Amino acid sequence: MNNRQATTIWSAVLVEELIRQNASMFCISPGSRSTPLTAAVARNPRASWKMFPDERSAGFFALGHARATGRPAVLVCTSGTAVANYFPAVVEASADFVPMIVISADRPFDLQECGANQTIRQDGIFGRYARWHMQLPQPSTEIPLQSLLSTVEHAVAKSLGAPRGPVHLNQPFREPFDPEPLEGQDPWLEPLQAWKLDGRPRTSSAQPERRPDARAMATIRELLATARRPLLIAGSIPSPDDARAVASLADDLRIPLYADLSSGLRLTEGTLAWQQAFATPAFLGRFRPDLVVHFGGRLIARHPSAALKAWKPAHYVVIREHPERYAPDHPVSLSLESSLQTAAEGLMGCRSEPSAIKEPAEGFFLHCSGALDDLTEASIPLSEISAARQISQLITPGEALFTSNSMSVRELDSFAAALQPDGLPCGLNRGASGIDGIISTAAGYGEGLGRKVTLLIGDIAFLHDLNALSLLRSLSRPMRIVLLNNNGGGIFSFLPVASCNDIFEEHFATPQHFHAQHAAGMFGLRYAAPRTNREFEECFLAAGEAPQSTIIEIASSRSENVEQHRTLQARFNAFAETAFTDR
């Protein structure tokens, strides 16, 4: 057996075992050194794959796909800076516990650190952001293929273990790279005959059941039973089953539930928008929880953290599926590692008295909802707030949402209507909260879910991932992109630096003076630029029926958006004063 044949077989075995381990989505960027891997994927009929000219975009697509499926997508690239372009997506996957597998082709040992072209030190390139990394050997008949199968299984298990995250396999190849099949049999392959025939993974790993500690659960039940003003928080919760269990617990105990957009519960019919309450001083003066039970990850809005930091509740309990710490302001009195669903179900029935805050709160939320609906009246000008509100009203149950960071996610989290009978998947990159790779991540998220996705994104984030528009023509379902173009970084207008007139516009707002119409034409996408709420509704619904992806660009003003936020917040404050005075 020659080197080409050994490399061909090695790559085919590696790819086949990944597929058997249920890591069957491959995001490939073309390159010469990675030819054996690319050929192995292309020639495996059970592999799903997508080609990406840009590794950075590929990394974020894989991230979005894994967010949707809960399984790692596999990234394949050539040597050199190609693998470095995955770094932002790897950081996000690590920070937000998303499984991912990177396989980078590399030069062999004798070409390392000697001036060889397109060669960098790739082993361990992701440092602490990888859950595990392995420098694989150059394919050789001297190395048992069983060890390769075992390594693949371990890589998948490490990606899916607690805490989930990215894994890196660095694979050196020696020329020639083009595949050459083996004619006949070879002793090297004999130990794999049974594996080849049965179609199952050679080794399977069972993840441990994350059952909660009985003593900790007894403590939490007692705290919930005796608290006067308890509050449940649903932070980032990837699993719909977990999210539903937390919502059921809140209903059973009749206590308030703060549902973050990333929990999947924020848009569920009947969910109260506690984001509005926590941003309202008059409300906060009447509600000071003495117990917080926080399920899942971090929150989008800063107001809850600021309020809880000031209130210092007697007990702050965090329940998560992994051992990593979540305590940004260090308020936690009890941390429990457990399946969220199991923990929520185990806390059912521990309290009979409803929270005293519920009745006045419901009146407050009803008035807030009416004020927001006033902003969506058909004939008035479209705004960032009314666009976010209408998206939540118009999107259908079989679709999904994805949102960029900065102002986009805050508009949806704060002002969306809760109308979905069974909730709605809503993805966002909140691990490191960057604005890079958002279009790519949304595309992967929709493909992973098998749903049409609507993306809400700002103009700076849109420019950051502009080349990802080339992906949209090949998606299985067209995407809506709702672009909030306020000509700069809108969130800075809400920060103290906005008062520094001599430096603000050029150094923070950074206006780019562009419109997306020509970008849409360049990539063969539909384009619309509505000006009123009625026009937006028409464009949004038409995009849902169109065979191509659509960019709906909303030209807005940063200063007008700030003023609308302040006016709305003043109304919310008045509603809170009335709701509590009337009692």
Curated annotation (Swiss-Prot):
Assigned EC number? 2.2.1.9
InterPro entries, per this entry? DHS-like_NAD/FAD-binding_dom (IPR029035), MenaQ_synth_MenD (IPR004433), MenD_middle (IPR032264), THDP-binding (IPR029061), Thiamin_PyroP_enz_TPP-bd_dom (IPR012001)
Recorded metabolic or biological pathway in which this protein acts = Quinol/quinone metabolism; 1,4-dihydroxy-2-naphthoate biosynthesis; 1,4-dihydroxy-2-naphthoate from chorismate: step 2/7; Quinol/quinone metabolism; menaquinone biosynthesis
Which UniProt keyword terms apply here? Magnesium, Manganese, Menaquinone biosynthesis, Metal-binding, Thiamine pyrophosphate, Transferase
Gene Ontology BP terms: menaquinone biosynthetic process
EC main group: transferase
State the free-text cofactor note.
Binds 1 thiamine pyrophosphate per subunit.
Q: Which reaction does it catalyse?
A: isochorismate + 2-oxoglutarate + H(+) = 5-enolpyruvoyl-6-hydroxy-2-succinyl-cyclohex-3-ene-1-carboxylate + CO2
Q: Which domain of life is it from?
A: Bacteria
GO MF terms here are:
2-succinyl-5-enolpyruvyl-6-hydroxy-3-cyclohexene-1-carboxylic-acid synthase activity; magnesium ion binding; manganese ion binding; thiamine pyrophosphate binding
Instruction: Name the coenzymes or cofactors required.
Output: Mg(2+); Mn(2+); thiamine diphosphate
- Kindly indicate whether the keyword Transferase belongs to this entry: yes
Q: Which Pfam families is this protein grouped with? A: TPP_enzyme_M_2, TPP_enzyme_N
Q: Which Gene3D superfamilies match?
A: 3.40.50.970, TPP-binding domain (3.40.50.1220)
Family membership: Belongs to the TPP enzyme family. MenD subfamily.
Question: Quaternary form?
Answer: Homodimer.
The record describes the protein's role as: Catalyzes the thiamine diphosphate-dependent decarboxylation of 2-oxoglutarate and the subsequent addition of the resulting succinic semialdehyde-thiamine pyrophosphate anion to isochorismate to yield 2-succinyl-5-enolpyruvyl-6-hydroxy-3-cyclohexene-1-carboxylate (SEPHCHC).
Q: What protein am I looking at?
A: 2-succinyl-5-enolpyruvyl-6-hydroxy-3-cyclohexene-1-carboxylate synthase
Origin organism is Chlorobium luteolum (strain DSM 273 / BCRC 81028 / 2530)
Which lineage?
Bacteria, Pseudomonadati, Chlorobiota, Chlorobiia, Chlorobiales
- Supply the gene name: menD
